Amino acid sequence: MSIRIIPQDELGSSEKRTADMIPPLLFPRLKNLYNRRAERLRELAENNPLGDYLRFAALIAHAQEVVLYDHPLEMDLTARIKEASAQGKPPLDIHVLPRDKHWQKLLMALIAELKPEMSGPALAVIENLEKASTQELEDMASALFASDFSSVSSDKAPFIWAALSLYWAQMANLIPGKARAEYGEQRQYCPVCGSMPVSSMVQIGTTQGLRYLRCNLCETEWHVVRVKCSNCEQSGKLHYWSLDDEQAAIKAESCDDCGTYLKILYQEKEPKVEAVADDLASLVLDARMEQEGYARSSINPFLFPGEGE
């Protein structure tokens, strides 16, 4: 199954009635999203060997919250949704959609917000980005979207991505339409922008027991059934790994068919789990999965591969 976004005026009456039974997509709910993430990162930093880096990530997340409301985005995406729907493509496809200068405006605002909080190497990095030309910044964004991580140093990538993510999340929040599940391929990528997931979550509340993958760029969540590999959609050779016990709130789902894994967070075990924060704070589990020979099928927006990795 794949997911396609349908313009509201093209939905039939039966689709309008059934679209919300199991929502294929959950568009980003931006209110306090970044504050919640920052709060969770700070909480997880306590007694964590990665505490300093988690607190660093919390500073970026908090800055995203501030910049989000200081620099709103106004954009009519109706025509874009119709065109993408007709082509069966993600409406905000990172490989096709032209980038507006708004994202660089967001980056400069993030840098201004973060400067007083940074020192040493981190301050040098954002000052270097501040001096970069428009074309240099565009080249780095294009490299990240092409997974050419050797062209963007791992210390610059989180700042570039934070601005791009804000821009794409703002656009995703403006999408006028519904989503429909259809037969198709590439369910491992976000149906809204085509980026990768950061992790998946088995939710509580109105989507109790359903698993959704969280986009590492536009913050959209999309439904993928449980006990199926989110990367290759096979189900016969899945294994579940945790550092604690079978009741752990964070597990890695590995697949021997494609050799990859993705983390699953369980809200029923820990209601405060957050897709980005808890993934970043559990890198010990990633190390275990690497030892077992599995490759990660996701990327955390605060931790990009460096050159040679």
Swiss-Prot record:
Cytoplasm listed as a keyword: yes
Record-linked InterPro entries: FdhE-like_sf (IPR024064), FdhE_C (IPR056796), FdhE_central (IPR056797), FdhE_N (IPR056774), Formate_DH_accessory (IPR006452)
Keywords attached to this entry: Cytoplasm
GO MF annotation: an example: ferric iron binding
Coiled-coil residue spans: none
GO biological process: protein maturation
Any single Gene Ontology cellular-component annotation: cytosol
Subcellular location: Cytoplasm
The keyword Cytoplasm is assigned to this record: yes
Its job: Necessary for formate dehydrogenase activity.
PANTHER family noted in UniProt: PROTEIN FDHE
NCBIfam families per UniProt: FdhE (TIGR01562), PRK03564.1 (NF002925)
Family according to the record: Belongs to the FdhE family.
Name listed for the protein in its UniProt record: Protein FdhE
Organism: Escherichia coli O127:H6 (strain E2348/69 / EPEC)
Gene (name only): fdhE
